[in-house]
Amino acid sequence: MQNQGVFILAIESSCDDTAAAVLYNDKVLSNVVANQLIHNQYGGVVPELASRAHQQNIVPVIDAALKKAGITKEQLSAIAFTQGPGLMGSLLVGSSFAKSLSTALNIPLVAVNHMHAHILAHFIDEEGYEKPEFPFLALTRSEERRVGKECLRLCR
């Protein structure tokens, strides 16, 4: 049987933006982001407000990503989601949705480290992606205190 390709739904909910992207093999078909502007009035992200907004945004964002990609959820081959680091309540919304949908569709679920994704996303472009040569050194900044350990693990 010939390989027909792989559709992946990627879900991001680590802080205050709810995002979903659909990829076909190495091409990004859609990328939909719902911003949470409510935090501007507080001078920073309020975790409780962020998780509540994710609950409101996750279904419309994923529906929009699938529609923009021109596929149905039944065509998905796998679901990837942010497992951390990030705000616990926000992460729980994304991970719970991803786990439920993957179970309902009986497709694989892939947990993704947020900081690894920041680093590796630079290798994706509209024409596909060029694989990095491992090991490599990367530097990233985050408010998380344990990020240094995670980056070292990726680069080994």
Cite the ranges covered by each PLM segment.
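Conserved phosphate-binding catalytic cores of ATP/NTP-utilizing and phosphoryl-transfer enzymes
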Residues: 1-4, 107-136
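Short, basic and Ser/Thr-rich N-terminal targeting/leader segments
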Residues: 4, 14-17, 132-134, 142
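Short Gly/Thr/Asp-enriched flexible loops that form oxyanion-binding sites at enzyme active sites
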Residues: 81-106, 124-125
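Short glycine-aspartate micro-motif
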Residues: 8-10, 78-80, 90, 131, ...
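N-terminal beta-alpha supersecondary unit
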Residues: 5-75, 81-85, 114
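Conserved small/polar residues in nucleotide/adenosyl-binding loops
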Residues: 144-151
